[in-house]
Amino acid sequence: MMSFVQKGSWLLLALLHPTIILAQQEAVEGGCSHLGQSYADRDVWKPEPCQICVCDSGSVLCDDIICDDQELDCPNPEIPFGECCAVCPQPPTAPTRPPNGQGPQGPKGDPGPPGIPGRNGDPGIPGQPGSPGSPGPPGICESCPTGPQNYSPQYDSYDVKSGVAVGGLAGYPGPAGPPGPPGPPGTSGHPGSPGSPGYQGPPGEPGQAGPSGPPGPPGAIGPSGPAGKDGESGRPGRPGERGLPGPPGIKGPAGIPGFPGMKGHRGFDGRNGEKGETGAPGLKGENGLPGENGAPGPMGPRGAPGERGRPGLPGAAGARGNDGARGSDGQPGPPGPPGTAGFPGSPGAKGEVGPAGSPGSNGAPGQRGEPGPQGHAGAQGPPGPPGINGSPGGKGEMGPAGIPGAPGLMGARGPPGPAGANGAPGLRGGAGEPGKNGAKGEPGPRGERGEAGIPGVPGAKGEDGKDGSPGEPGANGLPGAAGERGAPGFRGPAGPNGIPGEKGPAGERGAPGPAGPRGAAGEPGRDGVPGGPGMRGMPGSPGGPGSDGKPGPPGSQGESGRPGPPGPSGPRGQPGVMGFPGPKGNDGAPGKNGERGGPGGPGPQGPPGKNGETGPQGPPGPTGPGGDKGDTGPPGPQGLQGLPGTGGPPGENGKPGEPGPKGDAGAPGAPGGKGDAGAPGERGPPGLAGAPGLRGGAGPPGPEGGKGAAGPPGPPGAAGTPGLQGMPGERGGLGSPGPKGDKGEPGGPGADGVPGKDGPRGPTGPIGPPGPAGQPGDKGEGGAPGLPGIAGPRGSPGERGETGPPGPAGFPGAPGQNGEPGGKGERGAPGEKGEGGPPGVAGPPGGSGPAGPPGPQGVKGERGSPGGPGAAGFPGARGLPGPPGSNGNPGPPGPSGSPGKDGPPGPAGNTGAPGSPGVSGPKGDAGQPGEKGSPGAQGPPGAPGPLGIAGITGARGLAGPPGMPGPRGSPGPQGVKGESGKPGANGLSGERGPPGPQGLPGLAGTAGEPGRDGNPGSDGLPGRDGSPGGKGDRGENGSPGAPGAPGHPGPPGPVGPAGKSGDRGESGPAGPAGAPGPAGSRGAPGPQGPRGDKGETGERGAAGIKGHRGFPGNPGAPGSPGPAGQQGAIGSPGPAGPRGPVGPSGPPGKDGTSGHPGPIGPPGPRGNRGERGSEGSPGHPGQPGPPGPPGAPGPCCGGVGAAAIAGIGGEKAGGFAPYYGDEPMDFKINTDEIMTSLKSVNGQIESLISPDGSRKNPARNCRDLKFCHPELKSGEYWVDPNQGCKLDAIKVFCNMETGETCISANPLNVPRKHWWTDSSAEKKHVWFGESMDGGFQFSYGNPELPEDVLDVHLAFLRLLSSRASQNITYHCKNSIAYMDQASGNVKKALKLMGSNEGEFKAEGNSKFTYTVLEDGCTKHTGEWSKTVFEYRTRKAVRLPIVDIAPYDIGGPDQEFGVDVGPVCFL
């Protein structure tokens, strides 16, 4: 990045070059007009060979091209037509190839004879030296640091003309002298003209927070909140004060006749009536619990094949397979649309110097040239000794910031920052949503006695009081005399009671009498039971803002998070500043046909498609009966991790936290492994630009794109220039549901389905009496997933749940619309510097920052990879020759040049040093037979090469892609003869070559191991018919003979398709080197060999003269990691990693059979975990596991190794894996991984939406399970009513006929024994769990779970249910449970207690009375019997039953026991 910035500074300084001619011309619509010609903006032209101009936004900038004074290394340099400076002509190269087996190439021959001297040019008129110009005004720079600055190094690289040349004729140039010693440094140049404005600096660090602003204007009134829930009823108000006495009422009418007289004395009890007739049969009882499983029936006939199962979940991604063999070339795709014009390419590598061409014919005399440059200096003395190296210069000024990288993926949500300082109090907010009902408070202290309340409504008639004792009879009066018959008197008093008659039938209830006079005020009554919740009150006015909490202590620094996944490629940066045009390069070799590009990026979003047709309305689901509102349950445990919520509004600024402690120094890191092969050497000097290559053929067809949604054809838009990619916006709100999408493509074939459904159900048998609860049966195999049920009507919106913990980081959503900007928080105190994170993905482009002060001279970094080509710049002045560059990588083979003239024969070279043994090459295709050549002279024997050490055979690597063709290597030693391959197709018959010289016989090699058969190659093009020989039988391998005389190779046959690479054989021993043959003519470059090891560092050459600054290179490869810093403090915990892949689920163990219940002991300590059950069939795919530990450190430099970006390249892939790694993978792995993740998430969501009742996917209750899977049979399933962590799921019995969820008690029964002794004569109800020794209240569900978890499950089940039922079986011995046969009443019936402490009795309010299904405990018989109670209610909060209170117990011979039935919710 730094080097790029410095080069940008050079480019800016180049624009300040004093020789630039600025000609302001009239602008032609942003273009320019110059010398009568019109040019578009950014056009570059040469009005003369040694002048170049560019149109820059209406201004014409021209510059003289100054040729280099350096002598060219060629005998006859030429000035190409239209060019200014002389170049060496490029010779053609003959496409010859050295004969196979020939010795190494001889040394370079002597120079040829000098060419014919060219004609002398017209002498130029030497100019008089001009007077130096006056110094320019000092430059103005607003953002530069103050103080003296030295720009002379920048100016030194440019030739500054200081005057106009005039004067007399110059003599002929003398012969060139030897190079002089390096000249002294030049004088400083004139101050430059003001520079163009620099890049905008990056934003400064945030300043100190300003004072709090004034409160903003009040916000718009928000929409009305939803209606609050009904509040609880208030407590009864205190009685009002006593009112004033009312006015006297109007006199009432005359009263009615008085009541009958006092009631007479009660008669004696009558005799018992006759026994009534048998009552009508009772209502049919509820179905009993299911009986125990019957014996298995005979195997039925084969059922009809089941419906095809749904496709199974996709398997986890397999390990990466080996690269497949290279496919045959596909059909050429259709020609693509013309691409947009690319930026000018970077100059190609300098080509090799060709042989001198023949001198051209004399041209016509040219126009009189401009005054020539100053003549050569006279001959100088011999070169002096090179000076000592100068001290390194100071570090240059910091250049403008580089183009920022693309924005990375949105990271996972960071840990909460430290609390900010208190903000100014905000305006009062609108009314909040009504809160949830608070928990019931503790009872307050007892209030003072209230005033007398208003008298209540007359109560219902009480029960009859006990009979009074009969009074004594009064004495008889004397008989009176008979008087006259008077008028009928009033009704007399009642006579004495007659003989009691038989009890008559009960009369109808009489009408209520009028209210009696008001009684005296009674004493105030006790406080009544609190009333039920009243209607919800109106929401109260919002309270004032609470006071700020104290700042929390600073948290410890957590561990550093794992590096995030690599972000996507950023958008293309803006084009750089236009550079000077470079000199014309040599013709480059025509490029190979490029591979077809990958699919283009997505186009602009089309207009929305038409809405789909509205689907038919589904049939309404059955409406359940409305349940009464249950009591508020206790709060449930933490819910399942929710999907990530939308971003909340910005919170108030917290107070700044204190800075955390500084971390300790870390241990030094482990030494890194051996580095990969070094980067390519520095680029050679730029060659002349090549002629444009022929148009390449169309590449192979690209991968098939995904099916796009069919949008309506939009109108053709004008092609806009691509804008910069914006930063991702905040997440938008949830959009409205879109129209119905197109039908998806058919899914792949699913896994084999499970066995089909059971056969049709047989007729129902008669209902037997309910048996006791059976032992739990073995768990049956899971049935096949059923079809989704019909969607029911939309339920009413549920209450808002508590916020779940943050879910795992989802895939990045589409960028939402920009949200309103949040308030700016105050700046927190700076924390200690954390450990350097892995390099992040490049961020979006920032503005350029101001130049920093010069830093110290940095260590030279590794050479960067070439930068993207800039726009064409002005041509720079020709620089002095730089020091020789290191050899560049061999280029692709150039086109064959025309043959050059034969050079004179060179002297014989010395015998070359023996070459190191080459790697045995794979066996080549059969060459064409050459014609027999004339025998060559035998060369002298070469020195034997050293014997190489046999390396260890490595594991077979993946087949690498074919490399670029490299130069042909020198011949390797004779390899061990391999086994004959399968015969290849007949090649073209070549012309016979002349025989080669006889080589010395090699040492006999040891027999190699037989190689594996190679894959047969595909047929080559048909050759001319050879003389067919008869095919002989295959003989055994003979011992290797001496190598024969190699013939000259025929012309190369057509290249066959690449076969798969065979296993590499072990290196054979090196034979003695053959005598060097005569030097062959230079062959055409062979295919590129494998990359060589990095050579040893050569001796340091003498420092060359500083060349001109080169073009900006591509960004360098990432540097090697610096030394490990000190150990930092443990960072804060990173965000949760992505969920792991789905692990295979362990099968559930078989359930054991229950033993006989023993007597209830005190609760023991929790037992050890039982042994693992036997392996069952695999269950459904499990949820993703927790994140694994961090992986091993990735490859060096770049956060995510470049090898991963290159599609996980070959074995040797390193920092340059995108260039030297595997075949391109088109990044399909990323797509597959994303699709796998999506399918995995889809499967998990499917199991959440439609759980199957397994332990891994528990349902909420059995009713949900019945709706999702109507095919399931009644039995035991797992449910998780609180929908929290599924580790606390409980096993229940699901009645799939009704959808009831039944939870068994724990324990299931109370042992039958003598539980209670009471010697008092007066009996009463005694609660088993509260009062009896050894008694306990009944609990339910899994005993391994804590009691409070089970309570929460029950609370949720009650909320989810509208009905509940339970039965209890009371086993008795000499104890009455319900009806007392002796007295005929139920006074001795036992009581049951519900979970809300309500009591259920035999008679009274019908809502709290139980029913009796069977009553065998009606009298004392000395035998055991039983009574079965059942209680059903629409208030699920009343169940389950937690205690029982018998009445008729306490005697020494009275015993009882209880079977607690399951509680069932529906």
UniProtKB/Swiss-Prot annotation:
Region (Triple-helical region) location: 168-1196
Signal peptide feature range: 1-23
Connected disease: Ehlers-Danlos syndrome, vascular type: A severe form of Ehlers-Danlos syndrome, a group of connective tissue disorders characterized by skin hyperextensibility, articular hypermobility, and tissue fragility. EDSVASC is an autosomal dominant disease characterized by joint and dermal manifestations as in other forms of the syndrome, and by proneness to spontaneous rupture of bowel and large arteries. The vascular complications may affect all anatomical areas. Polymicrogyria with or without vascular-type Ehlers-Danlos syndrome: An autosomal recessive disorder with a highly variable phenotype and onset in early childhood. Disease features include cobblestone-like malformation of the cortex, polymicrogyria, intellectual and motor developmental delay, small joint hypermobility, vascular fragility, aneurysms, thin translucent skin and easy bruising, congenital heart defects, and foot deformities. Early death due to vascular dissection may occur.
Name of protein: Collagen alpha-1(III) chain
Intracellular or extracellular location(s): Secreted, Extracellular space, Extracellular matrix
Glycan attachment points: K263
Gene: COL3A1
Organism expressing this protein natively: Homo sapiens (Human)
Protein family according to the UniProt entry: Belongs to the fibrillar collagen family.
Subunit structure, interactors included: Trimers of identical alpha 1(III) chains. The chains are linked to each other by interchain disulfide bonds. Trimers are also cross-linked via hydroxylysines. Interacts with ADGRG1.
Record flagged with keyword NAD: no
Positions bearing 5-hydroxylysine: K263, K284, K860, K977, K1106
Record InterPro entries: Collagen, Collagen_superfamily, Fib_collagen_C, VWF_dom
Compositionally biased residues, Pro residues: 175-185, 890-907, 1046-1055, 1181-1193
Effect the entry attributes to changing G1176V: In EDSVASC; severe
GO biological process: aorta smooth muscle tissue morphogenesis; basement membrane organization; cell-matrix adhesion; cellular response to amino acid stimulus; cerebral cortex development; chondrocyte differentiation; collagen fibril organization; digestive tract development
Bias kind Basic and acidic residues: ranges: 229-241, 266-277, 823-835
Modified residues (4-hydroxyproline): 173, 179, 182, 185, 191, 194, 197, 203, 206, 215, 218, 236, 239, 245, 248, 257, 260, 281, 290, 296, 305, 311, 314, 332, 335, 338, 344, 347, 359, 365, 371, 383, 386, 392, 404, 407, 416, 425, 434, 443, 455, 458, 470, 473, 479, 488, 500, 512, 524, 530, 533, 539, 542, 545, 551, 554, 563, 566, 575, 581, 590, 599, 602, 608, 620, 635, 644, 650, 656, 659, 661, 668, 671, 680, 686, 692, 701, 703, 713, 716, 722, 728, 737, 746, 749, 755, 770, 776, 785, 788, 797, 806, 812, 815, 821, 830, 839, 845, 854, 866, 869, 875, 881, 884, 890, 892, 899, 905, 914, 917, 929, 935, 941, 944, 962, 965, 971, 983, 995, 1001, 1010, 1016, 1022, 1028, 1040, 1043, 1046, 1049, 1052, 1076, 1085, 1112, 1115, 1118, 1121, 1133, 1148, 1157, 1163, 1178, 1181, 1184, 1187, 1190, 1193
Propeptide residue intervals: 24-153, 1222-1466
